């Protein structure tokens, strides 16, 4: 029995796909691994809030010696519901201009729970080819009919809708707003227009990599494209730009009530710690005031994207602070990431099955606490690699 697993691991090593948990020490925007201190080019802390000491101290000052509980000790449907949860949900619903919001323990919990709760045998789920693994897992758990449309190919999506609009009672179209591996953005206005032509269609959008970063108030790509009110299921996470933990859905009250009664990861999980939810509440209140951080991040991102195009003469799909350098070959990608780490940059290889075969890459993630000079030095390092 054990030999089977040993052989599977040996195969992963032979394919340069073997993963190990790293031993890291975090020092602000830097990572220390063994004796090597590196600029962290792989973080999801897009606004730099997780390392913002002034923000942290302001939070503690607000609560002083009345800090929220460190654990909920139960699911929300039993004894694990605290006032701060309702306060955050109300704050978010008001900010988004929607009826309600609902919190979850993580983005993964949200994506594996919402779709199975909403779907049944009379439902068809249609997903962009490159949606996140958590959404794929949620679709599998839904046990309903499922097809994919080609990435960003909304003509292909409409063909699928035309073919199936009289066969199913409801069709759920699923996409990310900012895609996690390429950093490219969905055209949500096109998706909304399609939804409006097909009354049985619901639109499910995951804003994990857009919340905090995009939009005038930092509410994501849906805010930036002016279509928050037209998206039925608007999902996002607190564990990236907001420097916290957990996730949310913005939706109508009837959807919230349905999820509270039907969503298994919500019903059967211990709720987030109240302390964590209080921190998220505090950070979310700051989002409208972080325009300077968003502008700085956008400037850094544009500069790095253009540099990669110029240096390596490769196409650049990204429109965000997620900047891929696609090498293709697994071994070459691993070697290049190691060379960058030796030069003082914590860059990680992304390989199949996380990305499609033949598209192994290094995904650079920029954060708003990086300095222009640091990104300039990194670009100079990339230039040396190319020579």
Swiss-Prot record:
Q: Does the keyword Metal-binding apply?
A: no
List, alphabetically, the PROSITE patterns matched.
AA_TRANSFER_CLASS_2
Known catalytic reactions: 6-carboxyhexanoyl-[ACP] + L-alanine + H(+) = (8S)-8-amino-7-oxononanoate + holo-[ACP] + CO2
Q: Which residues carry this modification: N6-(pyridoxal phosphate)lysine?
A: 240
**Residues annotated to bind pyridoxal 5'-phosphate:** 107-108, 180, 206-209, 237-240
Identify the domain of life. Bacteria
Any GO BP annotation: biotin biosynthetic process
Pfam families found in the cross-reference section: Aminotran_1_2
> Cross-referenced SUPFAM superfamilies, in alphabetical order?
PLP-dependent transferases
For the keyword Transferase, the answer is yes
* EC number(s) from the headed UniProt entry: 2.3.1.47
Q: Which GO terms describe its molecular function?
A: 8-amino-7-oxononanoate synthase activity; pyridoxal phosphate binding
Identify the cofactor(s).
Answer: pyridoxal 5'-phosphate
Q: Which InterPro entries match?
A: Aminotrans_II_pyridoxalP_BS, Aminotransferase_I/II_large, AON_synthase_class-II, AONS_Archaea/Proteobacteria, PyrdxlP-dep_Trfase, PyrdxlP-dep_Trfase_major, PyrdxlP-dep_Trfase_small
Q: Which UniProt keywords apply?
A: Biotin biosynthesis, Pyridoxal phosphate, Transferase
Q: Which residues bind substrate?
A: 19, 132, 354
Q: In which pathway does it act?
A: Cofactor biosynthesis; biotin biosynthesis
Q: Would you identify the family this protein belongs to, as annotated?
A: Belongs to the class-II pyridoxal-phosphate-dependent aminotransferase family. BioF subfamily.
NCBIfam families tied to this protein: bioF
- Give the multimer and partner information: Homodimer.
Q: What does this protein do?
A: Catalyzes the decarboxylative condensation of pimeloyl-[acyl-carrier protein] and L-alanine to produce 8-amino-7-oxononanoate (AON), [acyl-carrier protein], and carbon dioxide.
Q: What protein is this chain from?
A: Putative 8-amino-7-oxononanoate synthase
């Amino acid at each position: 029995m054990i030999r089977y697993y040993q052989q599977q691991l040996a195969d992963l090593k032979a394919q340069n796909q073997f993963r190990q948990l790293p031993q890291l020490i975090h020092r602000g925007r830097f990572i220390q691994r063994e004796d090597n201190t590196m600029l962290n080019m792989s973080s999801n802390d897009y606004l730099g809030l997780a390392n913002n000491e002034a923000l942290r101290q302001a939070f503690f000052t607000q609560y002083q010696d009345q800090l929220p509980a460190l654990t909920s000790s139960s699911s929300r449907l039993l004894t694990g519901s605290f006032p701060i949860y309702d306060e955050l949900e109300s704050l978010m619903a008001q900010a988004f201009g929607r009826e309600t919001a609902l919190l979850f323990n993580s983005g993964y919990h949200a994506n594996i729970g919402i779709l199975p709760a909403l779907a049944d045998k009379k439902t068809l789920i249609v997903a962009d080819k490159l949606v996140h693994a958590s959404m794929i897992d949620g679709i599998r758990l839904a046990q309903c009919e499922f097809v994919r449309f080609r990435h960003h190919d909304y003509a292909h999506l409409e063909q699928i809708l035309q073919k199936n609009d009289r066969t199913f009672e409801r069709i759920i179209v699923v996409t990310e707003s900012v895609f996690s591996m390429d950093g490219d953005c969905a055209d949500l206005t096109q998706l909304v227009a399609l939804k409006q032509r097909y009354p049985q269609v619901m639109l499910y959008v995951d804003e994990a990599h857009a919340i905090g970063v995009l939009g005038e108030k930092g509410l994501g790509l849906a805010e930036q494209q002016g279509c928050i009110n037209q998206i039925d299921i608007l999902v996002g996470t607190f564990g990236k730009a907001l420097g916290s933990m957990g996730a949310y859905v913005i939706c109508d009250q009837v959807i919230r009530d349905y999820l509270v009664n039907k969503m298994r990861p919500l019903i059967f999980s211990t709720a987030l710690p109240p302390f964590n939810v209080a921190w998220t509440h505090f950070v979310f209140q700051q989002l409208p005031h972080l325009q300077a951080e968003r502008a700085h991040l956008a400037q850094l991102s544009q500069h790095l994207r253009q540099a990669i195009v110029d240096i390596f003469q490769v196409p650049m799909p990204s429109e965000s602070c997620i900047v891929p350098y696609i090498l293709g070959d697994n071994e070459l990608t691993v070697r290049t990431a190691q060379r960058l780490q030796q030069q003082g940059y914590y860059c990680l290889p992304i390989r199949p099955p996380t990305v499609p075969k033949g598209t192994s890459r290094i995904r650079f993630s920029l954060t708003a606490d990086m300095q222009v000079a640091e990104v300039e030095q990194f670009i100079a390092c990339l230039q040396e690699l190319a020579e």
